[in-house]
Amino acid sequence: PEQLDRMAQGMVDLVNKTRSAMSIDDYHFDVDAHDEVAHQAAIESMVLLKNDDDILPVAANAKIAVIGEFARTPRYQGGGSSHITPTKMTSFLDTLAARGVDVAFAPGFTLDLEPADRTLEAEAVETAKNADVVLMFLGLPEAAESEGFDRETLDIPAKQVELLKAVAAENKNIVVVLSNGSVVSVAPGAGNAKGILESWLLG
């Protein structure tokens, strides 16, 4: 018991000594500067996997449809112990709006592992029909990957693949932007999209 008390007291002493250093009440930093570093890192980490017919870069006057909830609710971190609370976060749709780019948006699916929502799917297909270019934000929702379990497949959720095929039946000018923290199969995009951009977790 005495040895246990000594060991425990050592931990208590360490906590007391470091408590002030761990306080963030008086901690200040340049949020915008840090955000710019993260922004630049995100840009430089993307990998262009496919670009048939030079579909990228998108022409300035192109009519753009953006499909996929990831465009509005981006994944910027992994699951489990890596969770953080960001000081600033900007979605793809936020960025387009800030630059004055007008796009048609439809979420197409929900960020969970539930079956497809046919109403969302139909809305997305209709949104994509008359666009010059369709940017489809697909990938792995947080529920599909984490440090606490193994994945059983390399595929993105079936409802997203179904949506991609449905949109491709109406519009062939598709660029898939992938959002994932671990490897995924690009086979669905390879057959149904002219462009594939691997963006990982842009945090």
What is each of the regions a protein language model found here?
Residues 20-34:
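Flexible, acidic loop-helix segments that line cofactor/substrate-binding pockets
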